[in-house]
Design a protein with these regions (language model features):
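A charged, aromatic-enriched C-terminal amphipathic alpha-helix characteristic of glycosyltransferases
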Residues: 330-364
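Nucleotide-sugar-dependent
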Residues: 15-19, 194, 253-258, 265-286, ...
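Conserved donor-binding/catalytic core segment of Leloir-type glycosyltransferases
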Residues: 178-197, 202-206, 214-217
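Acidic anion/phosphate-binding donor-loop and adjacent secondary structure
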Residues: 126-129, 163-182
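Nucleotide-activated donor-binding/catalytic signature segment of Leloir-type glycosyltransferases, i.e.
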Residues: 218, 229-256
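Carbohydrate-associated surface elements
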Residues: 144, 162
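N-terminal subdomain of nucleotide-sugar transferases
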Residues: 1-45, 207-209, 213, 369
Length: 369
């Protein structure tokens, strides 16, 4: 994809912590002009991140989404045109939305643009149905999410999460980790205030394995991915354990240096209560890129991939599975297993996913010509 003007509408603002929409924006900016729209706020400005990538801050009046559909579209059309005029934004060729709460009809920016709705999370709102109806194509990282839109005529495709190319870079700078270097090292990447954290199970695992070093990489307070911390007391509780090390948020480009130090990875969300929400976490590929074993709650998209991850159906069984794996970590990290995990991650880079998306877009556009 080259020479295009692309708007990306994100529910998470630009910041240190990257998820799919940030990675896509960064990659697309290498050969296109990308405008990354932060979620609405009281800020109104546009600024450069790097060549080809600008961040757009804007405000929207409250209550628009409670209006009747026809009135909402009229008002959003006026607001979109005003926003483009005030920021001197060029007409987009592609409008790619990850956010169902703003501009459900993307044609308000340009009726001739290709309109993409990309659902990477479960959104509890009927507004998402309008996004699907008005899009030219819908993508999602999980089949379970797409199942929610069954029967709707818009073309839909499951596209796995992507892996940034720097996770495959063999030239990794050395980093020093706190704690006894002889201990098994287990990593976790993500927001410790994520709404679906299973702290009861996590704390049990941490307490039962005091000779293992647990490294938590990611924000443990407010961040660009979550502005209202929920589990501050739980974070403080695990922080007091001698075998727990909170390393804080790290830029995506620095993560490989830390991940490649680990012997295993742990994921511990309340997945059985939120199967669709947990259907395909993006961090899985980052873990698999190291080749090391991943012990996790239930992940529907990987339910048939026991060759890649060690997974439980219920978190009741997670502590015992974790104990089994770390007691025999060398068995779970044989050369053949490591190679298989790495190959899977390499097949799912953002570059490869973007190629799949571009092929789909060409097919859809040719059918509408």
């Amino acid at each position: 994809m080259k020479g295009k003007c692309i708007y990306i509408l994100s529910p998470e603002p630009w910041g240190t912590n990257f998820v799919s929409k940030h990675h896509y924006a960064s990659l697309l900016s290498e050969n296109n002009e990308v405008y990354f729209f932060n979620p609405p706020s009281n800020r109104n400005k546009i600024f450069d991140i790097k060549k080809g990538l600008k961040i757009v801050d804007y405000s929207l009046p409250k209550g628009i989404n409670r209006m009747p559909r026809f009135l909402r579209v009229v008002i959003q059309s006026i607001l979109a045109k005003r926003l483009m005029q005030q920021r001197v934004l060029p007409n987009p060729d592609i409008i790619w939305s990850f956010d169902p709460y703003v501009f459900q009809d993307l044609s308000v920016f340009n009726k001739r643009a290709t309109k993409i709705y990309h659902s990477v999370d479960v959104h509890q709102t009927d507004l998402e149905l309008f996004c699907v109806t008005n899009a030219d194509v819908v993508f999602s990282t999980a089949d379970l999410i797409l199942d929610r839109f069954k029967g709707m005529p818009t073309p839909m495709f499951q596209i796995n999460h992507g892996l940034a190319l720097h996770f495959l870079d063999e030239d990794i700078r050395p980093v020093e980790l706190p704690g006894d270097s002889h201990n098994i090292k287990v990593g976790y990447v993500g927001n410790l205030n994520y709404p679906f954290m299973d702290y009861e199970t996590l704390y049990k695992i941490l307490r039962e394995h005091c000779s293992i070093n647990f490294y938590f990489i990611g924000p443990n307070s407010a961040s660009n991915l979550l502005d209202k911390p929920k589990y501050l007391e739980d974070v403080e509780r695990i922080k007091k354990l001698d075998n727990v090390f909170l390393l804080g948020a790290k830029p995506s480009s620095e993560l490989p240096a830390y991940l490649n130090k680990m012997d295993a990875f742990l994921m511990c969300y309340r997945a059985e209560e939120n199967i669709a929400h947990m259907a395909n976490p993006h961090k899985i590929l980052e873990y698999l890129s190291t080749g090391k074993v991943v012990v996790t709650h239930y992940i529907d998209q990987y339910k048939d991939r026991s060759d890649l991850i060690e997974m439980v159906r219920s978190n009741v069984d997670l502590p015992s599975l974790f104990s089994k794996v770390v007691a025999n970590v060398e068995v779970y990290n044989t050369i053949s297993k490591v190679i298989a995990r790495k190959l899977y991650a390499q097949e799912n880079t953002y570059t490869n996913q973007l190629s799949k998306i571009e092929t789909i877009l060409k097919s859809i556009n040719s059918n509408t010509d």
